[in-house]
Regions:
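4′-phosphopantetheine-dependent carrier domains
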Residues: 1-200
C-alpha cells in the first residue's frame, strides 16, 4: 500500500490484512530496522501509539537501519545504476541544488523507495506515484529526484521551488493557507519516526 493510504489508527494487523505470518515478519523487520531485540506493544498499537513506543525503544534511531538500507540500496541500483548515480548524488542534489535541509534527504530517499514500486496497492490504485522505469542518464535522474522532492513537499504541506541561479540560498518554500483540515496521515520518515518496511 501507499504511504498516503496508511492512517494513524492503522495497526500492524490492519497493515497486513490480519495475515499472522506477514504481521510477524513486519514486527521482526521493525525490530531489525531499529536495532533492538523487540518492540514491546508494537503488535497491538495504532501507528500514533507505535510512534511513541518506537521513540522510547530506539531514541537514537536515524534513517536508515538494516532493513531499509538494504531495500533502498537495491532499489536505487535498479533506478539509477544505468545513469551511474549513487546515493551521494541524490543527497547533493537535495542539499546543494534544492538547498534543503538534511532531514529532506531521508524523506526523498524513502519516497524513491516507496513511490516507485510497481503493481497495485491492496487499498486500491497503483503503488507508484513516480515513474518506475530505470533512468538512463543524469538529466533523467535529476528529473526523478526533483519529482520525489515535490512528493515530499506535498506530504509536508509546503510548496518548494528550485532556487534561481545566483539567487538567495535555500529553496523557496511556503506553507499554503489552511482551509479545511485534511485527514491525518502517516508522516514521511524522519529520525523520530522511522518509515514502515518496504514490504508494507
Amino acid at each position: 500500500m501507499r504511504l498516503d493510504q496508511i492512517g494513524s489508527n492503522d495497526t500492524t494487523d490492519t497493515l497486513t490484512n490480519g495475515v499472522s505470518s506477514r504481521r510477524n515478519q513486519l514486527l521482526m523487520d521493525i525490530s531489525s530496522e531499529l536495532g533492538v531485540a523487540s518492540v514491546d506493544g508494537a503488535a497491538e498499537a495504532t501507528l500514533d501509539k507505535l510512534a511513541q513506543i518506537v521513540n522510547k525503544a530506539a531514541p537514537n534511531y536515524k534513517p536508515f537501519g538494516a532493513v531499509l538500507s538494504e531495500a533502498l540500496r537495491d532499489r536505487l541500483r535498479s533506478l539509477f545504476g544505468a545513469a551511474g548515480v549513487k546515493q551521494q548524488y541524490i543527497r547533493d542534489r537535495v542539499t546543494n541544488v534544492w538547498q534543503l535541509g538534511e532531514g529532506w534527504v531521508a524523506s526523498v530517499l524513502a519516497t524513491l523507495l516507496l513511490d516507485t514500486r510497481e503493481g497495485a496497492s491492496s487499498r486500491g490504485g497503483d503503488l507508484a506515484k513516480l515513474p518506475t522505469a530505470a533512468v538512463q542518464n543524469k538529466p533523467e535522474a535529476d528529473k526523478l529526484i526533483d519529482a520525489a522532492v515535490e512528493v515530499v513537499a506535498q506530504l509536508k504541506g509546503v510548496a518548494v521551488a528550485l532556487p534561481s541561479a545566483g539567487g538567495a540560498a535555500g529553496a523557496l518554500w511556503s506553507i499554503p493557507p489552511r482551509s479545511t483540515p485534511s485527514p491525518r496521515r502517516s508522516p514521511v520518515p524522519t529520525a523520530c519516526s522511522p518509515p514502515p518496511p518496504a514490504s508494507c
